[in-house]
Amino acid sequence: MMYHIPGVLSPQDVARFREHLEQAEWVDGRVTTGAQGAQVKNNQQVDTRSALYAALQNEVLNAVNQHALFFAAALPRTLSTPLFNRYQNNETYGFHVDGAVRSHPQNGWMRTDLSATLFLSDPESYDGGELVVNDTFGQHRVKLPAGDLVLYPSSSLHCVTPVTRGVRVASFMWIQSMIRDDKKRAMLFELDNNIQSLKSHYGESEEILSLLNLYHNLLREWSEI
């Protein structure tokens, strides 16, 4: 399943990020990809050795960790270190699949269950640059407002179309979920959304408490901690 997570960063935060990123040191994006990805990748990434990068990636982690909808959809166990990329002048990233595991500074290794892109450019400011994701439900083309995030299974083939005008800047990361199975995670997300909707309409009740009990028992049964 694919999820749109709105408002991860406020417009003020996005403007501040863009101002900082204009001063950042950018390097060839192929430095962080494997042999297969390097053949189809043509973009730039912020140099991860800089102090500016360390500060910005920490802010992204704080923002997603504090976003209730992100947590409900991803049920994250481990988040990768966020990276930042830039596309301009017909740069693109052809169809590829993300690696199944990635190194992690604290945990050694993490499994990539979900991929996330946090958009930092207004969609009207550039042409092209759509994230195209192929999954069991078909092909999805994504170009979200700045500050919004998209979550999708890391097992999906995906690409970024050429940016023919302007500049597309984004942050991206991977998530190891407490729930490995996409279908089970989607069911828990739907159940959680329905519980929250019922509570907002009817307040607390024995029936809602029973559903909440079911949610946590399923989470207990399926989670890998």
From Swiss-Prot:
Residues noted as binding 2-oxoglutarate in the record, renumbered to the chain: R168
| Transport in keyword set | no
| Pfam families listed in its UniProt record | 2OG-FeII_Oxy_3, PKHD_C
Q: Which UniProt keywords apply?
A: Dioxygenase, Iron, Metal-binding, Oxidoreductase, Vitamin C
Give GO MF terms, alphabetically. Answer: 2-oxoglutarate-dependent dioxygenase activity; iron ion binding; L-ascorbic acid binding
**Residues reported to bind Fe cation:** H96, D98, H158
- What detail does the entry give on cofactor binding? Binds 1 Fe(2+) ion per subunit.
Domain of life of the organism encoding this protein: Bacteria
Please report the stretch or stretches of sequence annotated as the Fe2OG dioxygenase domain.
78-177
Cofactor(s) listed in the protein's UniProt record = Fe(2+); L-ascorbate
Q: What is its EC number?
A: 1.14.11.-
Looking up SUPFAM superfamilies in the UniProt record yields:
Clavaminate synthase-like (SSF51197)
Q: Does the keyword Oxidoreductase apply?
A: yes
- Alphabetically, which GO biological process terms does the record hold? DNA damage response; intracellular iron ion homeostasis
Q: Which NCBIfam families match?
A: PRK05467.1-1, PRK05467.1-3, PRK05467.1-4
Q: This chain belongs to which protein, by name?
A: PKHD-type hydroxylase YbiX
Gene transcribed to yield this protein: ybiX
